[in-house]
Amino acid sequence: MHHRKYFGTDGIRGKVGDMPITPDFFLKLGWAAGKILARQDSRKIIIGKDTRISGYMLESALEAGLAAAGFSALLTGPMPTPAIAYLTRTFRAEAGIVISASHNPFYDNGIKFFDINGSKLSDSLEEAIEAQLEKPLTCVESAQLGKARRIVDAAGRYIEFCKGTFPSEFNLKNFKIVVDCSNGATYHIAPSVLKELGATVISIACEPNGLNINKECGATNIGMLQKSVLAEQADLGIALDGDGDRLIMVDHLGNKVDGDQIVYLIAKEACRQQQLKGGVVGTLMSNMGLELALQRLKIPFIRAKVGDRYVLEKMQKHGYRIGAENSGHIILLDKTTTGDGMIAALQVFKVIIQNQMTLHELCSEIKLLPQVLVNFSFSGNKNVLQSDAIASLVKKVESTLAGRGRILLRTSGTEPVIRVMIEADQEEHFIKTLAEEVAEKIKKSLY
């Protein structure tokens, strides 16, 4: 793969005002994307965004660049990332663009693209866009310029799509649900979906002001949701992230239910209904408890690199329909093309209704193993973990764990840090000591 200057594993991301998250770069990017994606028949591109204040500025720049390349932008206003993937498909648009930095703070922003099928752009297309950025910007003839318009009722269309993934014979009349929208893009979607299906809904963090997205709320910070579920004596709580592609749940006792537990419930039910195609894709960070629980049900499980893009690649390669990251990206290819927090939540409600059990009872079947992560910084070579000494150290730890746990060593993709992760069916203090010993030994072998 070529070295890419701007695109990372999940589009382009950074601090607003610093290159490349600037209005002049976004204008050029809109033009470059338009030039590369142009086909004769369709000149439409859908643009959505989350609730960051900077989204308005960046959207205007992007739409000007697209217009210069002869593309008309269809604007949805604040909408979840998975909604843009869906609308791109239904409008037969050339591409969908989301302006968002997902679970990052408000002063960051970013951009990601979907192709005509609602999937992430291929590496080769991203590289072609980067190459086009090097060329001077030229306008098409005046008569061919694009113009922006709003999609009327984009939210309503997506709400109906979400509801359509829930069995029509079921409703949520007996549920009291707390929903935390992270002051993000699902603020006008998630509460409506749940209310229209009959639930009693208590909404928190559903009042975005451009600056409060992900601030002490949402899927990466569930403290407020846990308190609220207990105070309201709700049946459960759901937390989405700023752009709506992650889901974390909370049971009626205030316990966290993460992506590993959620995907287990959905896969087990699909297996029970004889609708499971293949198995489940997780990541290197998926808890071993998930692997063991799926093993008991004879459901195949494979691990991908961390990142929803890699999970999807593995799913497509093996023909699996269910994949997830423990952080709450749940990909259900029988329902949609990308991770979708709202749709994943509805599938969990379906499992609860079909089994007539609480979320807490359902989760008791999967025992997550205690997991300890020790990080330490290092300087120098990326391949430090490749030595024979470290390989034999890993073997030693694995024999200590005797098949009831695992050790993972990896260097961070974003900072000079080595991560030592150990999880095992053991007391937490035993694992912590073991992880710290391993970290010390690696440090010694480096210097």
UniProtKB/Swiss-Prot annotation:
Cofactor: Mg(2+)
Single GO BP term: carbohydrate metabolic process
Modified residues (Phosphoserine): S102
Record-annotated active site: S102 (phosphoserine intermediate)
UniProt modification remark: Activated by phosphorylation.
An example Gene Ontology CC term for this record: cytosol
Disulfide bonds: none
Keyword Magnesium: yes
Domain of life of the source: Bacteria
Catalytic activity: alpha-D-glucosamine 1-phosphate = D-glucosamine 6-phosphate
This protein's UniProt keywords: Isomerase, Magnesium, Metal-binding, Phosphoprotein
GO molecular function terms attached to this record: magnesium ion binding; phosphoglucosamine mutase activity; phosphomannomutase activity
Residues binding Mg(2+), per UniProt: S102, D241, D243, D245
PROSITE patterns in the cross-refs: PGM_PMM
Family affiliation: Belongs to the phosphohexose mutase family.
Main function: Catalyzes the conversion of glucosamine-6-phosphate to glucosamine-1-phosphate.
Name the UniProt record assigns to this protein: Phosphoglucosamine mutase
Organism: Hamiltonella defensa subsp. Acyrthosiphon pisum (strain 5AT)
Lineage, top ranks: Bacteria, Pseudomonadati, Pseudomonadota, Gammaproteobacteria, Enterobacterales
Gene (name only): glmM
